[in-house]
UniProtKB/Swiss-Prot annotation:
Belongs to the heat shock protein 70 family. GO terms for cellular component: cytosol. GO terms for molecular function: ATP binding; ATP hydrolysis activity; ATP-dependent protein folding chaperone; heat shock protein binding; protein folding chaperone; unfolded protein binding. One of its GO terms (biological process) is chaperone cofactor-dependent protein refolding. It comes from Shewanella oneidensis (strain ATCC 700550 / JCM 31522 / CIP 106686 / LMG 19005 / NCIMB 14063 / MR-1). This is Chaperone protein DnaK. InterPro entries: ATPase_NBD (IPR043129), Chaperone_DnaK (IPR012725), Heat_shock_70_CS (IPR018181), HSP70_C_sf (IPR029048), HSP70_peptide-bd_sf (IPR029047), Hsp_70_fam (IPR013126). Induction: By stress conditions e.g. heat shock.
Length: 639
């Protein structure tokens, strides 16, 4: 059985880890980095992922996708999506089913399809390290992701060619990474996870006893649309406003300028975590009739903190709710762990310290802990890690819509999973022959205020007065937090069930088609790689041949020289095209035309070899007459 890898599919950065010699190891990608920007770009002939995609974003803003995780499993009309529609340089559109999709070069794409490109890179990184094919993974999601978002993440894995063995919550993964080596005792840990696009707080009890470890999530809460991207956007808007005040031009209307502004804002934010002031200097940011314009703005740490103060305060309310749900007070928390790149901001650390009354731990890498935890969970599933039990929870309550548009809960939030629950309902009208089971997720009493996960009908109910038929509804949540629902007429035994699969917005057929497309692209990518290889070999041969022609000088007959130059010209022309066979044919023709050059080079080598041999003999004869001399080493202090 191959290795199961652990992947942190992040909003801003992603990371992959594997168990290596019993320890979780974070892997370096092809660029030599341990984290990969979650950025995907589409050009005329290829898909670019990670740092290379980030580098070209300024010149290709409309087809470069970042923070795609904020759209995964969401509806286009959601308030959070509408906010992003107005600030993202790329196009966010409504799919036929009402989901939020993106568009690039006329192609409409589902967020899981785009996210799959990042997962493919993580998969390839692991395969390069392990030297074998990888087909299974544990993928992390924010603890507060709903059923749709979890299912969409699983779909992304399938499209990338991975069987997702488990979906694990990010704070839980971080707690695994922190607690796996801890000795005896019972610890209650608060994991504050402020990433690029999402915020989670989880209260986790770690019980270590005689080599056995139990990680039990007591409560979780959060906001799936609050993270570092929002901090960046505050700074971007501030810079755009300052420029407008000074120059009278609105950079928000220029996608290229906004992409440069985004890069600069992100860089400035990072710098202000270690310095009190920085300068954003962007020459030639735009131009008008009077000429080019430059943006130069000084930003202090205090200014940045004032811009994002309300965002930091927004993270504190979920902390209070999670503690209340776990029936704990601040004094019950033994350790605080910070996860996610945005927690490097001193003001965030200060807010967390003030809330919990203790310093967060500094020995957990906020960028890598989640991937490490995913790799440990992968080890648990494969049997490589023993004596570890992970008890996670469902973050939101689950129920159905009942008479009066009320949500009736069957499973309360923070229930340990996997779990089952059942309840008997009845009809609302006399002689009702069918009931609609409308499945909801959320905490509101009003059904319409919660997230609709799907609905199905149970028909064939025998005519009877209202309230008489007995319809048993069963909810079953698996270890990934994904829901299966069934409804049974207890009198007839007729049953109808639904796995909330299409809640990701993609039908089984659509996912299967995307898997096929991804496989086809893999073949395309392979062909493209082979084409580039042929081009490189051809270029190298032309370069070497030119050098040999120069070195041969007059020794090369003019007729042969003309043939070689014509062959080189043919190679240079072929290299500009996309026909691999034509390039290889032209390359072979050049090799054959250069036969005379090879003869000249060999003759020259033999001549030089003979001369060197004669010189060596002369040198040896002289050496026989040499007498060794005594010597004394002169120390520096004697000089």
């Amino acid at each position: 059985m191959g290795k199961i890898i652990g992947i942190d599919l992040g909003t801003t950065n992603s990371c992959v880890a594997v168990l290596d010699g019993g320890k979780a190891r974070v892997l370096e990608n092809a660029e030599g980095d341990r984290t990969t920007p979650s950025i995907i770009a589409y050009t005329d002939d290829e898909t670019i992922v990670g740092q290379p995609a980030k580098r070209q974003a300024v010149t290709n803003p409309n087809n470069t996708f970042f923070a795609i995780k904020r759209l995964i499993g969401r509806r286009f009309k959601d308030d959070e999506v509408q906010r992003d529609v107005n600030i993202m340089p790329f196009k966010i559109i409504a799919a036929d089913n009402g989901d939020a999709w993106v568009e690039s070069r006329g192609n409409k794409m589902a967020p899981p399809q785009v996210s799959a490109e990042i997962l493919k890179k993580m998969k390839k990184t692991a395969e390069d390290f392990l030297g074998e094919e990888v087909t299974e993974a544990v993928i992390t999601v924010p603890a507060y992701f709903n059923d749709s978002q979890r299912q969409a993440t699983k779909d992304a894995g399938r499209i990338a060619g991975l069987e997702v063995k488990r979906i694990i919550n990010e704070p839980t993964a971080a707690a695994l990474a922190y607690g796996i080596d801890k000795k005896q005792g019972d610890n209650i840990v608060a994991v504050y996870d402020l990433g690029g696009g999402t915020f989670d707080i989880s209260i986790i009890e770690i019980d270590s006893n005689d080599g056995d470890q139990t990680f039990e999530v007591l409560a979780t809460n959060g906001d799936t649309h609050l993270g570092g991207e929002d901090f960046d956007n505050r700074l971007i808007n501030y810079l755009a406003d300052e420029f407008k005040k000074e120059q009278g031009l609105d950079l928000r209307k220029d996608p290229l300028a906004m992409q440069r502004l985004k890069e600069a804002a992100e860089k400035a934010k990072i710098e202000l975590s270690s310095t009190n002031q920085t300068e954003v200097n962007l020459p030639y940011i735009t131009a008008d009739a009077t000429g080019p314009k430059h943006l130069v703005v000084k930003i202090t740490r205090a200014k940045l903190e004032s811009l994002v103060e309300d965002l930091i305060i927004r993270t504190l309310e979920p902390l209070k709710v999670a503690l209340a749900d776990a029936d704990l007070s601040v004094s019950d928390i033994n350790e605080v762990i910070l996860v996610g790149g945005q927690t490097r901001m001193p003001k965030v650390q200060e807010a967390v310290t003030n809330f919990f009354g203790k310093e967060p731990r500094k020995d957990v890498n906020p960028d890598e802990a989640v991937a490490v935890g995913a790799a440990i969970q992968a080890g648990v599933l494969s049997g490589d890690v023993k004596d570890v039990l992970l008890l996670d929870v469902t973050p939101l309550s689950l129920g159905i819509e009942t008479m009066g548009s009320v949500m009736t809960k069957l499973i309360e939030k923070n229930t340990t999973i996997p779990t089952k629950a059942q309840q008997v309902f009845s009809t609302a009208d006399d002689n009702q022959s069918a009931v609609t089971i409308h499945v909801l997720q959320g905490e509101r009493k009003q059904a319409s205020a919660n997230k609709s996960l799907g609905q199905f009908n149970l028909d064939g109910i025998e005519p009877a007065p209202r309230g008489m038929p007995q319809i048993e509804v069963m909810f079953d949540i698996d270890a990934d937090g994904i829901l299966h629902v069934s409804a049974t007429d207890k009198k007839t035994g007729k049953k109808q069930n639904i796995t909330i699969k299409a809640s990701s917005g993609l039908s089984e057929e659509e996912v299967a088609q995307m898997v096929r497309d991804a496989e086809a692209h893999a073949e395309e990518d392979k062909k493209f790689e082979e084409l580039v290889q042929s081009r490189n070999q051809a270029d190298g041969l032309v370069h070497a041949t030119k050098k040999q022609v120069e070195e041969a000088g007059d020794a090369l007959p003019s007729e042969d020289k003309a043939k070689i130059e014509a062959a080189m010209s043919a190679v240079e022309t072929a290299v500009k095209g996309n026909d691999k066979e034509a390039i290889e044919k032209a390359t072979q023709a050049l090799i054959e035309a250069s036969a005379k050059l090879m003869e000249i080079a060999q003759a020259k080598a033999q001549t030089q070899g003979g001369a060197q041999e004669g010189a060596a003999k002369q040198s040896n004869a002289t050496a026989d007459d040499v007498v060794d001399a005594e010597f004394e080493e002169v120390k520096d202090d004697k000089k």
